[in-house]
Amino acid sequence: MARYTGPTTRVSRRFGQQILGSGKAFERRSYPPGQHGPKLRRKVSEYAVGLNEKQKLRYIYGLLERQFRRVFEIAKKERGVTGERFLQLLETRLDSVVYLLGLAKSRAAARQFVNHGHIRVNGHKVDIASYNVKAGDEIEVKNSPASRQLATRCLEENRIRNVPGWLSMNAETFKATVNRLPTRDEMEQGINEQLIVEFYSRF
């Protein structure tokens, strides 16, 4: 299945909450696409509920099913609560971190920013969006006019966005630090990760 590139508001309406940074259009029409107004929805099966939750999280991070499932399998093999570790692995992807730091308006834009070589981690170029940062990592925008002009514009546009406590950002030096790994309340809200764990346990 290809990565979704269509209208973001349609995705938000499908899941009943803002996904992929959509805004006012979703607020006007928060009911599912295809309906001409809000109406009661039929009771859905446990399988459908789990599938919906999985798809919602996959859209938020913009991953293909194969990539998404691979991250889940890694989380399942590690110590700790599988669902929480799964979210942690998604949230600490380099593209997600770049987005959270305000260096891109969306995770999709952050993925391009990383892929185009604008980011350094611990002094080394990292152009792999799926790279997982760890506590103590130093992240920096490449010291070039093109990279820093782009970063400056994004930081200005996203200045009202709060950087989560597990990260720190110095906009003047274009440097950030991973203070620690995120806790559950610092990660994606509106997601019931246990439903995703139960969904994948069926296979």
UniProtKB/Swiss-Prot annotation:
Keyword terms of this UniProt record: Ribonucleoprotein, Ribosomal protein, RNA-binding, rRNA-binding
Cystine pairs: none
Highest taxon of the lineage: Bacteria
Gene3D superfamilies: Ribosomal Protein S4 Delta 41, Chain A, domain 1 (1.10.1050.10), RNA-binding S4 domain (3.10.290.10)
CDD domains attached to this UniProt entry: S4
GO biological process, one term: ribosomal small subunit biogenesis
Keyword rRNA-binding (UniProt): yes
GO terms assigned for molecular function: rRNA binding; structural constituent of ribosome
Chain ranges of the S4 RNA-binding domain: 92-164
GO cellular-component term (any): small ribosomal subunit
Alphabetized InterPro entries for the sequence: Ribosomal_uS4, Ribosomal_uS4_bac-type, Ribosomal_uS4_N, S4_RNA-bd, S4_RNA-bd_sf
Subunit note: Part of the 30S ribosomal subunit. Contacts protein S5. The interaction surface between S4 and S5 is involved in control of translational fidelity.
Function: One of the primary rRNA binding proteins, it binds directly to 16S rRNA where it nucleates assembly of the body of the 30S subunit. With S5 and S12 plays an important role in translational accuracy.
Family under the similarity heading: Belongs to the universal ribosomal protein uS4 family.
PANTHER family: 30S 40S RIBOSOMAL PROTEIN, SMALL RIBOSOMAL SUBUNIT PROTEIN US4M
Protein name as catalogued: Small ribosomal subunit protein uS4
Organism: Opitutus terrae (strain DSM 11246 / JCM 15787 / PB90-1)
Gene: rpsD
